[in-house]
A protein has these predicted regions:
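Well-ordered alpha-helical scaffold segments within catalytic/enzyme domains
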Residues: 1-13, 77, 123-126
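Short, well-structured beta-strand segments within conserved domains
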Residues: 118-120, 130-134, 149, 170-179, ...
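A short beta-strand element within beta-rich, extracytoplasmic domains
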Residues: 131-138, 343-359, 363
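Short, surface-exposed beta-strand/strand-loop-strand elements in extracellular ectodomains
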Residues: 142-150, 361-374
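Long hydrophobic segments that form regular secondary structure
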Residues: 112-141
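C-terminal beta-rich recognition modules with glycine/proline-rich loops and embedded aromatic residues
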Residues: 18-27, 32-123, 158, 167, ...
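Extracellular carbohydrate recognition and processing domains
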Residues: 374-399
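Short strand-edge motifs at loop-to-beta-strand transitions and within beta-strands
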Residues: 161-165, 337-339, 388-392
C-alpha cells in the first residue's frame, strides 16, 4: 500500500496520501518489528488481548521475514519529494537530504513522534528562489506553527494540506515546525460501540493481562476525550484511561509493544446501555476466557503460515473468505484435507470445528483422527447467518501417549467436507 500511495502522490501531491503513508509507516511497518531482537511478525493482530508472534533467526523463518526486513527502508523513502523548483517535506523524520538539483543540503532535526517539533536547516553555496511545501497533518488540529528564522509565518490553510513557503532561501536559513498531536478516537466501521485511541497519527495499544476480564468504557459518546484519558507518568507518549470497567489500562504506542498482550480496539457503552447488556457481556467474556484456557492448539485455514505450521494437505480443496473476513477451506467431490494438531498425551481432548450456519446438506463428510473415524457429519443449515462451533469427542486411546495427531475431513461421494473456518484441540471439561 505504501508503494501505491507513493505512485498516487507522484501523480497528484495531496497531503491526504502522506497522512495515510505516515499512519501505515508507524502503525504497521514500525510496529511489525521487535526493537530488541530485530525479528518481525507474520501478521499484526489487533483483536482483544492480542500479542505479537515474532520470527526467530533459525526456526520460524517464513517468506514474510524477507519482505518484513525490506519494509524498513520505507522510513527514508517518503520523507521528501521534488519537482523542478519545489520540494515537499512529507514526513517528520531526522534526516539529511542532498538536493543535488539545487546544490542544497537540508538537515531535518526531530525526535518525532516522541516530540511535537521539527526543524529544517538549509545549506547552500548560493541563494536561490524556490518553494518548500511543508505538510500540515490532518491530525494537527490545534497549535500548528511554522517559523522561518524565528519569524512566525501566517497560515491560512487547514489541516490536511501543504504550507507553501516561496522565497529567496539563503545558507543557514532555519525553519521550525511545531505540531501538537491531538488525542482522538476512531470508531471501527460497522460497529459504533468499538473504537481505537490515537495520539496524532500514532495508534495506542492498551496493555493487557490475558487472564483479565474484558475492559469496556462507560462514557457518553459525545463526551470530551479528556474525560476518558489522561497523560501517564510513565513516558511522554503513554496515557492512562479514566473510565474503564472493571479497571483502567495503560495506553502506549502500538509500535513500542514487543512483548505482552495488548488491545487496540475497545468497547464503549453509555451507562444505561451497559446495565442492559452487562450480564450477557460477562457470560461471553467468561466463555472466551475458558475456551482460551482449554485450547491446546488452534488452526486457521487459508492462511499460509498456519497451514505450513500444521502441515496442511488436501485433494480437491477450495479456499475462500466468508462473513467478517473469516477465511475457510473445504473439499469437494469426495476430496479431503488434513492438518496436524497438538494434543495432550495424558488427558482426553476434544476437536472443535467452526462452521457457517447457512451450510446445509451439500456438506456430508467423515472426520478422522490418525485415519480412525470419530464422526460422520451432515450439516443442516439450521444456524443461518452466524458461525457456530461443534465439539467432537476424541477417544482417549487415539491420543494417549501422543503429542500430535492428524485431523482429516473426507467428503462423501459428490459431497463436500467442511466448510471450516477454524479448528481447535481443547482439553475435555
Amino acid at each position: 500500500m505504501l508503494k501505491l500511495t507513493g505512485h498516487l502522490f507522484a501523480w497528484e501531491p495531496k497531503a491526504e496520501y502522506m497522512d495515510y503513508y505516515e499512519r501505515a509507516l508507524y502503525n504497521h511497518i514500525l510496529a511489525s518489528q521487535n526493537h530488541e531482537t530485530g525479528m518481525v511478525v507474520y501478521s499484526l493482530p489487533l483483536a482483544y488481548a492480542s500479542f505479537k508472534e515474532f520470527s526467530t533467526p533459525e526456526h520460524s523463518f517464513w517468506c514474510c521475514v524477507g519482505t518484513g526486513f525490506e519494509n524498513h527502508v520505507k522510513y527514508a523513502e517518503g520523507i521528501y519529494s521534488e519537482s523542478e523548483n519545489d520540494l515537499y517535506i512529507n514526513l517528520f523524520v531526522a534526516s539529511r537530504l542532498n538536493w543535488r538539483r539545487k546544490g542544497m543540503i537540508i538537515e531535518q532535526q526531530t525526535e518525532f513522534p516522541e516530540s511535537d517539533k521539527s526543524s529544517l536547516i538549509l545549506r547552500c553555496a548560493k541563494s536561490q528562489t524556490l518553494t518548500l511545501h511543508i505538510r500540515y497533518p490532518q491530525w494537527a488540529t490545534t497549535g500548528y506553527t511554522i517559523k522561518v528564522n524565528d519569524k512566525i509565518q501566517e497560515i491560512e490553510k487547514k489541516p490536511g494540506s501543504y504550507i507553501s513557503l516561496n522565497r529567496l532561501w539563503k545558507d543557514g536559513d532555519k525553519i521550525e515546525i511545531e505540531m501538537p498531536k491531538s488525542l482522538h478516537k476512531e470508531v471501527l466501521p460497522g460497529d459504533e460501540h468499538k473504537f481505537a485511541f490515537l495520539n496524532g497519527p500514532i495508534v495506542l495499544a492498551g496493555e493487557m493481562d490475558l487472564d483479565e476480564r474484558k475492559i469496556v468504557f462507560l462514557e457518553k459518546k459525545d463526551s470530551e476525550l479528556r474525560d476518558w484519558i489522561q497523560p501517564s507518568n510513565r513516558t511522554k507518549t503513554s496515557f492512562i484511561t479514566k473510565t474503564g470497567f472493571p479497571k483502567n489500562v495503560e495506553l502506549v504506542p502500538l509500535y513500542k509493544k514487543s512483548d505482552g498482550h495488548y488491545s487496540v480496539y475497545f468497547d464503549c457503552y453509555e451507562p444505561s446501555e451497559w446495565e442492559q447488556i452487562r450480564k450477557q457481556y460477562e457470560e461471553e467474556d467468561k466463555f472466551l476466557r475458558e475456551q482460551e484456557r482449554r485450547t491446546l492448539d488452534y488452526f486457521r485455514p487459508n492462511e499460509q503460515q498456519p497451514e505450513t505450521d500444521h502441515r496442511f494437505r488436501g485433494e480437491n480443496v477450495e479456499r475462500g473468505i466468508g462473513a467478517s473476513s473469516r477465511k475457510w477451506c473445504q473439499a469437494y467431490d469426495g476430496g479431503n484435507f488434513s492438518f496436524e494438531m497438538k494434543v495432550d498425551p495424558h488427558a482426553p481432548v476434544d476437536l472443535v470445528l467452526t462452521y457457517w450456519g447457512d451450510d446445509g446438506a451439500d456438506y456430508q463428510f467423515d472426520i478422522l483422527i490418525d485415519d480412525q473415524l470419530i464422526s460422520s457429519e451432515v450439516l443442516t443449515g439450521s444456524c443461518r447467518g452466524e458461525y457456530f462451533d461443534k465439539e467432537y469427542a476424541i477417544p482417549f486411546n487415539l491420543t494417549q501417549g501422543k503429542s500430535e495427531v492428524v485431523v482429516t475431513l473426507h467428503a462423501h461421494r459428490w459431497k463436500k467436507a467442511g466448510r471450516i473456518f477454524g479448528g481447535r484441540i481443547m482439553l475435555r471439561k
